[in-house]
């Protein structure tokens, strides 16, 4: 069996930390975008944290958003490009801390976007500080 990554996924190294799930999740996301036939009609919105590194490992269309503002940005992209598959891709810190109100209100408005939240239980891009999803007793750089 000869397996090959879709052309949407560039070959080579990524900037993700060893053991980080973003690379795997990103690859699965873009493999599915290709499988569904949306490679020419998809936009992925990422924030400034770790997920923004996906922009450098794919040939997909991206929009960068401020930290925690992925969902309102994705909502605007969807309104401008109604026929596109719009994916909001961000981490738990962005979704459940600074962007929590956007998470709630996007759900209430029933926005027609795909939302992916990667829960690594810390603010990873800034060194592993506690996040709203940090487990009790979990060691972080900002834990007591």
Sequence positions of predicted segments:
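Hydrophobic/aromatic-lined pockets within catalytic cores
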Residues: 34, 108-111, 130
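Thiamine diphosphate
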Residues: 50-144
């Amino acid at each position: 069996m000869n397996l090959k990554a879709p052309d949407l996924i560039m070959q080579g190294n990524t900037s993700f930390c060893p053991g980080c799930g973003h690379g795997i999740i990103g690859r699965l996301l873009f493999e599915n975008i290709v499988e569904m036939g949306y490679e020419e009609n998809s936009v992925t919105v990422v924030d400034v944290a770790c997920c923004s590194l996906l922009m450098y490992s794919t040939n997909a269309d991206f929009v960068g958003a401020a930290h925690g503002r992925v969902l309102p940005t994705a909502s605007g992209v969807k309104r401008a490009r109604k026929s596109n598959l719009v994916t909001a891709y961000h981490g738990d810190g962005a979704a459940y801390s600074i962007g929590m109100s956007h998470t709630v209100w996007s759900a209430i408005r029933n926005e027609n976007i795909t939302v992916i939240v990667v829960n690594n239980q810390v603010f990873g891009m800034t060194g592993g500080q506690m996040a709203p999803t940090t487990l009790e007793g979990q060691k972080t750089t900002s834990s007591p």
